[in-house]
């Protein structure tokens, strides 16, 4: 029989494995590819050694090691990210280098939740990972069923304490190693299939960029004699049609205007959509009323803010970051989308200073408002060089 051609006609979803060191994240990743490859559907088995030697990538100047595997179930196509070290997870989640629409939290039944289990759940909450599914691994190392129940209760309480729905989250018990070694199918292969069924069902299908509200960060502003003002940029989400009303948000008071023309590659279009680099002609807007760093957006869809809480990774000296710590009242530039805005940092009460290589949650007060929602990524810069990366976790004002 000829090999079936791989067609991506299924919805796509990005997931990853998170959890404490040595609880079995990479083994589970390999086991998923093995079990699904054997189940058919054009999947390829990727062994542990190949996932473990993750290539180093540079994202916004930060060195991150990540492994990417892909597989599909009957209902979805997945891109799955696995990181070798704890620091890689922290950097990955904060920079959004590998976007996660959901995650599989791996907890060893023998150890229960450990410090990095907590930290990864907290990070998932802070950076806005929408849903988690739990794989309780190494159940063959625990003889007492009551102990397994206790560990499950502990995991559910921990999830609830970080505002995840601990009572509802699916927890699948099994052994990733048993699945890899073709032993004990009940906790091996069957458990992996149950896990993927839970992931299919419980992790919501992400909204495609095209289906979201229109947003375009403004990169440049031109005035074209006899036509008016044109702003250019890459449409991040949604669609804008000629004749639609939009808002210009950020840096100054929000203004409404109408898009009277959309141009791409010097051709006139009826609309611009997510991914397009366009020029938008704005009715009755003076060249001086709009600037780089603002966004064009569907009216009412996004608001400007100056104060927020953020989860931040501070680059190490080796990554080209600072060589010295910084303290409260540190005033760097915050680079959002297309521009820098100065902001002042407020550290948590128990933190005196922040060292290069740290990750930390702190408050920021900008000198000018930026269009933002929780989940927006930014870089921290000093004199044009990146010294940190962050994500807005909540908006204060």
Curated annotation (Swiss-Prot):
The keyword Cytoplasm applies. Mg(2+) binds at residue 26. Residues 10-207 form the tr-type G domain. Gene3D superfamilies: P-loop containing nucleotide triphosphate hydrolases, Translation factors. Its EC number is 3.6.5.3. InterPro entries: EF-Tu_GTP-bd, EF-Tu_GTPase, EFTu-like_2, EFTU_2, G_TR_CS, P-loop_NTPase, Small_GTP-bd, T_Tr_GTP-bd_dom. Residues 61-65 are annotated as: G2. Its main location: cytoplasm. It catalyses: GTP + H2O = GDP + phosphate + H(+). Residues 82-85 are annotated as: G3. It is found in: Cytoplasm. It comes from the Bacteria. SUPFAM superfamilies: EF-Tu/eEF-1alpha/eIF2-gamma C-terminal domain, P-loop containing nucleoside triphosphate hydrolases, Translation proteins. Keywords: Cytoplasm, Elongation factor, GTP-binding, Hydrolase, Magnesium, Metal-binding, Nucleotide-binding, Protein biosynthesis. Residues 175-177 are annotated as: G5. GO terms for cellular component: cytosol. GTP binds at residues 19-26, 82-86, 137-140. Residues 137-140 are annotated as: G4. Residues 19-26 are annotated as: G1. It is an enzyme of class 3 (hydrolase). GO terms for molecular function: GTP binding; GTPase activity; guanosine tetraphosphate binding; translation elongation factor activity. GTP hydrolase that promotes the GTP-dependent binding of aminoacyl-tRNA to the A-site of ribosomes during protein biosynthesis. Belongs to the TRAFAC class translation factor GTPase superfamily. Classic translation factor GTPase family. EF-Tu/EF-1A subfamily. NCBIfam families: EF-Tu, PRK00049.1, PRK12735.1, PRK12736.1, small_GTP. Monomer. This is Elongation factor Tu. It comes from Zymomonas mobilis subsp. mobilis (strain ATCC 31821 / ZM4 / CP4). The gene is tuf.
């Amino acid at each position: 029989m000829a090999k079936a051609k791989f067609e991506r006609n299924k919805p796509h979803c990005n997931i990853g494995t998170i959890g404490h060191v040595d609880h079995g994240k990479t083994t589970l990743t390999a086991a998923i590819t093995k079990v699904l490859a054997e189940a058919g559907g054009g999947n390829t088995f990727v062994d542990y050694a190949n996932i473990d030697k993750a290539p180093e990538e540079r994202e916004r100047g930060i060195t991150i090691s990540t492994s990417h595997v892909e597989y599909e179930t009957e209902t979805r196509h997945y891109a799955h990210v696995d990181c070798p070290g704890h620091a890689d997870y922290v950097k990955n989640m904060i920079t959004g280098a590998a976007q996660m629409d959901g995650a599989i939290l791996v907890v060893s039944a023998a150890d229960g939740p450990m410090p990095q289990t907590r930290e990864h759940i907290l990070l998932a909450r802070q950076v806005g990972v929408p849903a988690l599914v739990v794989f309780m691994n190494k159940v063959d190392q625990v003889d007492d069923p009551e102990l397994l129940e206790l560990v499950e209760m502990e995991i559910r309480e921990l999830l609830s304490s970080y505002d995840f729905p601990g009572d509802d989250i699916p927890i699948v018990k099994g052994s990733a190693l048993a699945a890899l070694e073709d032993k004990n199918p009940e906790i091996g292969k069957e458990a992996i299939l149950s896990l993927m069924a839970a992931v299919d069902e419980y992790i919501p299908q992400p909204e495609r960029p095209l289906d979201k509200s229109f947003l375009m960060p403004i990169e440049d502003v031109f005035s074209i004699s006899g036509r008016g003002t044109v702003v250019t940029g890459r449409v991040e989400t949604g669609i804008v049609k000629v004749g639609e009303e939009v808002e210009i948000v950020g840096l100054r008071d929000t203004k409404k205007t109408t898009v009277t023309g959309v141009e791409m590659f010097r051709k006139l279009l009826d609309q611009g959509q997510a991914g397009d680099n366009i020029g938008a002609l704005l009715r009755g807007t003076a060249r001086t009323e709009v600037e780089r760093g603002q966004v064009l957006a569907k009216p009412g869809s996004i608001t400007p803010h100056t104060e927020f809480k953020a989860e931040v990774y501070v680059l190490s000296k080796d990554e080209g970051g600072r060589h010295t710590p910084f303290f409260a009242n540190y005033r760097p530039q915050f680079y959002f989308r297309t521009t820098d805005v100065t902001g002042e940092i407020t550290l948590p009460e128990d933190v005196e200073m922040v060292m290069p290589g740290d990750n930390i949650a702190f408050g920021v007060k900008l000198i000018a408002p930026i269009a933002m929602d929780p989940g927006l990524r930014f870089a921290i810069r000093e004199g044009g060089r990146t010294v940190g990366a962050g994500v807005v976790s909540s908006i204060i004002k």
